[in-house]
Amino acid sequence: MASSANALRLGLRTCSRPTQTSNLRIAALQRRALSATATRCEGVPVPKREDDAKLEFTRPYNPGEFLSEKLRSDDLQDWERERYERALTSWEQTPDDLKRGWSTMIRDIEQAAAPLRRVVMPRRSTFWYEEEKDTDLITNEDGEDDFHENDIMSLGHGKLEEHREFREYARIAVWEMPLLSKYAKPFVPPTSEEVLRFRYTTYMGEFHPADRKVVVEFCPKDLRDLSEVQQRKLMKLAGPRYNPEKDIIKMSCEKFEHQAQNKRYLGDLIEKMIAAAKDPKDTFEDIPLDTRHHTFTKKISFPKEWLLTEERKKELEAARQQALLKDAEKVVQGALVDGADVVKQYLESGAAEALHAVPVMAGRGGKALPGGKGGKMQRSKR
């Protein structure tokens, strides 16, 4: 109970204390919602920026002044002081004309280096300092002239570049290509032992990821050391790479970086397939040849029965002559109907105007209705 009473007493004492009022600090300046300049107090002097032309730079010393300044320093060691004294003695013994030349050279260096040592003050009156010169940008204005706005567009330059490329290849075709004739070799057809036909893809003048691809084709029947059973097994091992319509196995490889590697891989793969086809353990005779991967295209040819023979040509010519003779007889008898004359006579007789549609006034109020009950277009003869 004692602890509870003490806690209650402390709580009542805290609540009975008067509330302290906090002294808020009033800002001396009025705050602005948006400002682009720093806040300044009235009466405080603003430091003025010195003009660039009034800035003074330290003039470089000549050797005599530099050595005398060094000798007046107390921080030199004995061996350093001896070295500076010898150098100062040597400078005093130098002829006056050399000293004047040295002074002239120092003056020229000072005048040339003065703009480089001048402090570049930013122009705060411009937006983003866009009028300032970029000191890091080095340009060579020798030989440059003003742009007269008379140049062609980039599309025209591209067309000219394309024309130059065509002319370059034309010069190569005229002057360099004929020189390759001395490297020409006569064509020698492949022998019966060369059954593999390799095909390569080359992009002249550029590197292309597809130029590594190598394609090989061969006919199983060209492998004379395989029997018919082994040849059929080789076709079944090739799977969808076998074309039953052309009787050719076609394979390709582009997994390696160079063409020689892909060609070597295809050669090793064909050797493994031939070795598997020669394996007498399983000849695959109980497995039919699957050709579902190939779509057979039926080539429709013109029937030989429909070809015109010499006898048929004579029969058609005789039938045409008979038809012409019959037409000539009808013309003489006046029984041949000429379609152009019939149409002309019909138009001249005026019978066509008699069949024109004439609107008949029908309906209520004496109005002609375009359609519906009582408003149909009727035909009548005049």
From Swiss-Prot:
Role this protein plays: Component of the mitochondrial ribosome (mitoribosome), a dedicated translation machinery responsible for the synthesis of mitochondrial genome-encoded proteins, including at least some of the essential transmembrane subunits of the mitochondrial respiratory chain. The mitoribosomes are attached to the mitochondrial inner membrane and translation products are cotranslationally integrated into the membrane.
Pfam families in alphabetical order: MRP-S28
S-S bridge residues: none
Protein family (similarity comment): Belongs to the mitochondrion-specific ribosomal protein mS35 family.
InterPro entries, per database record: Ribosomal_mS35 (IPR017081), Ribosomal_mS35_mit (IPR019349), Ribosomal_mS35_mt (IPR039848)
Subunit (UniProt): Component of the mitochondrial small ribosomal subunit (mt-SSU). Mature N.crassa 74S mitochondrial ribosomes consist of a small (37S) and a large (54S) subunit. The 37S small subunit contains a 16S ribosomal RNA (16S mt-rRNA) and 32 different proteins. The 54S large subunit contains a 23S rRNA (23S mt-rRNA) and 42 different proteins.
Residue ranges, annotated region (Disordered): 363-382
Keywords carried by this UniProt record: Mitochondrion, Ribonucleoprotein, Ribosomal protein
Any GO molecular function: structural constituent of ribosome
Primary localization: mitochondrion
Lineage: Eukaryota, Fungi, Dikarya, Ascomycota, Pezizomycotina
Protein name according to UniProt: Small ribosomal subunit protein mS35
PANTHER family referenced in this protein's UniProt entry, alphabetically: MITOCHONDRIAL 28S RIBOSOMAL PROTEIN S28, SMALL RIBOSOMAL SUBUNIT PROTEIN MS35
Biased composition (Gly residues): 363-375
UniProt record, GO biological process: mitochondrial translation
GO cellular component, one term: mitochondrial small ribosomal subunit
Protein location: Mitochondrion
